Amino acid sequence: MIHQYFAACPKGLEGLLLQELQALGATDTRETIAGVYFNGDLNLAYRTCLWSRLANKILLPLANFEVNSQEDLYEGVRMLPWQDHLSPSGSLLVDFVGTNDAIRNTQFGALKVKDAIVDCLRDFSGVRPNIAKRDPDLLVNARLSKNKLVLSIDLSGESLHRRGYRLKQGSAPLKENLAAGILIRAGWPEVAAQGGALLDPMCGSGTFLVEAALMAADIAPGLGRASFGFERWLNHRNDLWLTLREEAHHRRKLGLAKVNLPEIRGYDADVRVVRAAEENIISAELDHWLRVSRKELAEFKKPTHRAMDYGLVLSNPPYGERLGEIESLKLLYAHLGERLRNEFPGWRAGVFTGNPELGKQMGLRADKKYKFFNGTIASELLMFSINTDVFVQSRVEQDGRFSKDEVERDAAEQKVKAAAKEEQAAALSNGAQMLVNRLQKNRKQLEKWARKNEVSCYRLYDADMPEYAAAIDLYLGQTPPNRAPQLYAHVQEYAAPKSVDEARAAQRFADIEAAVPYALDIPVSHISYKQRRRNKGSSQYEKLNERPTGDLFSVQEGQAKLHINLWQYLDTGLFLDHRPVRHMIANMARDKRFLNLFCYTATASVHAAMGGARYTVSVDMSNTYLNWARKNFALNGLSEARNRLEQADCLKWLENNDQQFDLILLDPPSFSNSKRMEDILDIQRDHVEMIHNAMRSLSEEGTLIFSNNLRNFKLDLEALGAYNIEDISARTIDEDFKRNPKIHQCWLIRH
């Protein structure tokens, strides 16, 4: 049965909590102050109690009514069937929040609610329940706002931020769910997915460290709690709960068994605080993976025991209110900025502070600021990309020479750059100059469309000039961990026909190589050049070169973040022409069972999962692409428990499948003779049988999306006459591919 629930959280976490609930499977989510309403079944409520890193409470509303008098409150509560929720011999506790003219004291309000419940149960059975101040059988939550009371069962019991691992704490500890929200805002899930490290130079009792490890190892935050509020509720389903706990224990085991768990380390100058952090880490059973040690901030630097090319430095420095404390903190912030600039180039850094103005002392320019509340203290998370173009003069530096030098250095660099640009222009051939003009014209036209539609990757040029037969795609990518976006270009030169001699073909390619960096004003290192040919067998999966993986980056497409590799394979990991299809899948996927056949890097599955799919299954024969898909899921914080990847011949898999799916994407290659396939795949010849098999796996009300890139493909409508078929090809061609409307064809097929 579907119910509406309310997840309470600290102010500032509402948007993140909404996304988390959607990822857990919640529907009809609605954000409000300090919480999110959502719909789901009891299994989802249990899952949320176990897996939410951000919520304080999960409440099941029973009733809401007007309260204009004490009698209204008593009668409104008493009329509910409390015998359905609590045994008359059980124990009860009421949590009452809010006042109005009739109920001026929360203790009095709690007493009236308690009296009404007790009287109801006594009238029903002749027995009255006990009142328990700790660990009751039923915790009732009553919230009065103006004259409206919302009465709920508190399924969580003790606040969910109490994970169970914190035995000791520092002088001003962060609540665990606030720490988790800060980590998410700081981009830790993405950094961890890339194998980046987390370092906290002022770790206190280790809350950031433990919460970061729970995320990286896929450990449910509620797994260490002693109890929840629903366990002695009369409607409790212990079978559901035990299944969820077993799943969580299994995921924890798998997560901690990973050989590539990120490095997580903390430091603090106070040895007593370090000991408290160590005890908490042991309590969380993470002492084999987390390390804390006593270290002054002045000693803070990148560890050398293993390679750490990138990562996240995250800290919550001390707060101060008195003048002397503020002045000391200015120096502390300045020193922290110096440590970051000197020791962690290329990293990301986050500083959570109740004194945001102090961030200006760090000599770094924050690229993002997020507002939070630490209890009642308005706070901010300041995020920094640690590279020279965000370095600014610290307010505590003694004079202005640094600023003057930097201005002079920048002017010199601009002068050199301008001279190099002039040299490039002089070296362009007439043909290359024509190509430059076309690229710049196309970019001007497409950039407006791309910005309006939040498109970060698009096709700039597709053999617009026949003598320069190439496709040029632009990618606005972020290298880990979330550095400032940079522009990259992917150039695919189509093989010249035999009628064009090799010398002329070579000259045209040289023109392209000269024109692209000049027209786009990007470094050559950001451009990948390839020649597109029809590949055979496994060659389509072979690496083209051994360029370091550090050059990989991610792009944002809708809600999804996707890994891109411009250099090592023929394709980049993302087929740009299918962008509208992926967006369509994201919009169609909520609560659907999604199957992705010939899934490639599973980008459509990521969109489906981010769109609220019940679960996804992605099938492909290439282990290379499935590993890539795993990275895409991890990049978006999506678990393989609900997003299964299967290495198989898709045709054989379909023949043997007995599962039903509500949404299927069938996007096969036009031709394949891979050694792993028993037969050669020819899409024109084989599509009817393939679609019939896919339709057997489609639920009665489901939708099959069938697409392919064979230019002269003809769908056999007569052989597929039993189905409802809609050609949506025109709707799946975006602005950047309108020059080539035959880039793919696409149909919706239903029973």
Curated annotation (Swiss-Prot):
Domain (THUMP) ranges: 44-155
Disulfide bonds: none
Pfam families named in the record: Methyltrans_SAM, RlmL_1st, THUMP, UPF0020
Family that this chain belongs to: Belongs to the methyltransferase superfamily. RlmKL family.
Official protein name in the record: Ribosomal RNA large subunit methyltransferase K/L
GO cellular component: cytoplasm
GO molecular function: 23S rRNA (guanine(2445)-N(2))-methyltransferase activity; RNA binding; rRNA (guanine-N7-)-methyltransferase activity
Subcellular location: Cytoplasm
Swiss-Prot/TrEMBL catalytic activity: guanosine(2445) in 23S rRNA + S-adenosyl-L-methionine = N(2)-methylguanosine(2445) in 23S rRNA + S-adenosyl-L-homocysteine + H(+); guanosine(2069) in 23S rRNA + S-adenosyl-L-methionine = N(2)-methylguanosine(2069) in 23S rRNA + S-adenosyl-L-homocysteine + H(+)
Function comment: Specifically methylates the guanine in position 2445 (m2G2445) and the guanine in position 2069 (m7G2069) of 23S rRNA.
EC number: 2.1.1.173, 2.1.1.264
Annotated signal peptide: none
Principal EC category: transferase
PANTHER family in the cross-refs: RIBOSOMAL RNA LARGE SUBUNIT METHYLTRANSFERASE K/L, RIBOSOMAL RNA LARGE SUBUNIT METHYLTRANSFERASE K_L
Highest taxon, organism lineage: Bacteria
InterPro entries: 23SrRNA_methyltr_KL, DNA_methylase_N6_adenine_CS, RlmKL-like_Mtase, RlmL_1st, SAM-dep_methyl-trfase, SAM-dependent_MTases_sf, THUMP_dom
UniProt main location, coarse: cytoplasm
UniProt keywords, alphabetically: Cytoplasm, Methyltransferase, RNA-binding, rRNA processing, S-adenosyl-L-methionine, Transferase
